[in-house]
Amino acid sequence: MNAIPLEHGLALASVLFALGLVGLMVRRNILFVLMSLEVMMNAAALAFVVAGSRWGQPDGQVMFILVLSLAAAEASIGLAILLQLYRRFHTLDIDAASEMRG
């Protein structure tokens, strides 16, 4: 069975990371910002898996598990902030979060 070349896997991870970064910069809705962060984290995890597969080391898979647990924690905290923002201001606009300080 032929493996996917390292360049193809890293190119896909780079494209996914760039798409997540664009979504992070362009969108003002906090839900889309969280989704863009998830795409970026999954792109980094994909790069770890591809690199670990290339050199036959399980380190990439271990890093993937760590990134996956970090993404789960980030999603739960982000969704909790999203719920509080919506309950207080009835909007999901990320600029409304600056008004939460008072």
UniProtKB/Swiss-Prot annotation:
It is found in: Cell inner membrane. One of its GO terms (cellular component) is NADH dehydrogenase complex. The chain crosses the membrane at residues 6-26, 30-50, 62-82. Keywords: Cell inner membrane, Cell membrane, Membrane, NAD, Quinone, Translocase, Transmembrane, Transmembrane helix, Transport, Ubiquinone. NDH-1 shuttles electrons from NADH, via FMN and iron-sulfur (Fe-S) centers, to quinones in the respiratory chain. The immediate electron acceptor for the enzyme in this species is believed to be ubiquinone. Couples the redox reaction to proton translocation (for every two electrons transferred, four hydrogen ions are translocated across the cytoplasmic membrane), and thus conserves the redox energy in a proton gradient. NDH-1 is composed of 13 different subunits. Subunits NuoA, H, J, K, L, M, N constitute the membrane sector of the complex. This is NADH-quinone oxidoreductase subunit K. The gene is nuoK.
